[in-house]
Curated annotation (Swiss-Prot):
Residues 124-142 have a biased composition (Polar residues). This is PH domain-containing protein DDB_G0274775. Disulfide bonds: none annotated. Residues 143-154 have a biased composition (Low complexity). Residues 15-112 form the PH domain. SUPFAM superfamilies: PH domain-like. It comes from Dictyostelium discoideum (Social amoeba). The lineage of its organism: Eukaryota, Amoebozoa, Evosea, Eumycetozoa, Dictyostelia. SMART domains: PH.
Amino acid sequence: MSEPELKVSVSQLAPSDREGWLTKQGGSIRTWRRRWFVLKGKKLFYFKSKGDIEATGLIELEQNSFVKEEKDKDKKKKYMFTVGTSKRVFYIFAETETDMKQWMESIKRNLDGEGGMKSGGNDIVSSPKINSEPTPKVNQNGSAPEKSSLSSPRSKISNAKSIIPFLREEESKVLEFWQIWSESIPPQSDLQSGTAIEFHVATSIDMQKLTWRTAGPQNIFIQKMVDFFWNVGAPESEIDRLNDVGAIINPVKIGSWIDMSDKGGMDGGWYFPVDIPLKLAIEASDAGEPTRKLSEWAESNEVVNCYSIGRDMGAAPPRQTETRFKLPGPDFIAQLNLAVDAFKTFEFPPIPSNALEILYQSSNTLEAGGLCLSVITSSEGFVRLGLLIPKPTRDVVGQLCEIGQANRERISKFETALGGCGPAFVEFQYLQKGFGYTVYKEGFDIVFHYMVGEDQSE
């Protein structure tokens, strides 16, 4: 298809043979998009809206093309049909059975005008599991309620939420945001044998900022994630970016995260918790001085791979991309010194001496090696840098609570709600000035990360 063929508006195609809203599967990660379709002769155009002056795409109907009704095995897209060409089979669904049949009849009629309909066709690939409508509005119904025990990770994160004062206010927009996100998590019943959904939560030491994360198999997560991003107003360009990065990395596991604060901060995004070359992660980030510095530092210190890449889906730029990787080095001290060097190289203030001293003094009791770095970049500069220390001892956690003036009682209640385990990681992080947007604490902070648990396939 030539680009000039797309340079046509909806109005220029009038009178059309048929037009209206349909939802089409597209992208390398098979998400569903609502599009305004216009059938004109043997060309089926689709637009992002009915007022667009240029088409998003075009399905060219050929002599051997076909159209037929499809049965979605999960019965969640009842009125689905396919349009097949020599290059691809397009999966499309309508809102009603009548609409579906009228579209199919119109396409058949236009096909019959030149050689007639083909009843057969190419082999049809199986439809993926799609779980909710991708319309940019809040899903009032949400996921079907799970019958979960008090020990399930879903129950634990819900219980932990109730410990947080700013998440107990009934009219809270932040609470509503949390609920929309939690309803976007696929049900346990969607899991296939040998797969799982993992749950994580992190809190700043003063418990005024929290991060919630969940991840699982790509095939059951992707559509619910996209629906969540639509529902909270993420721009379509960033949903396209998710598809583009997903096509490059093709992760088996994907997930979503949300940040929130007592000052009304609400942010969300996606992440791929998979091992990939760091160069690939940097290519997925917005180019700029930070990515250049990170690339040079990583190369000089033999940092080759990362274990997670994520990105925010906020309504306005600059976009932020987080990369996490393990620090090389023969032991804890060598890795800690390398982390200190990273703070200096990336022009962050040094980790406060009292916090750093706790690590040096406890190096024999902390896990040998295993230190990780979290780097968040944007086109406008480094955003945040974090040093992640795995399996901190109770003594280390206690000392950090002391210097961070933590509310020990509230943290204890929070941990009890999560099942009684201590942090899986403690993070020393620094948020650069200007990136707190008045709702997140800028400067140095201590964050506790918890692995809440997993939903296993039944």
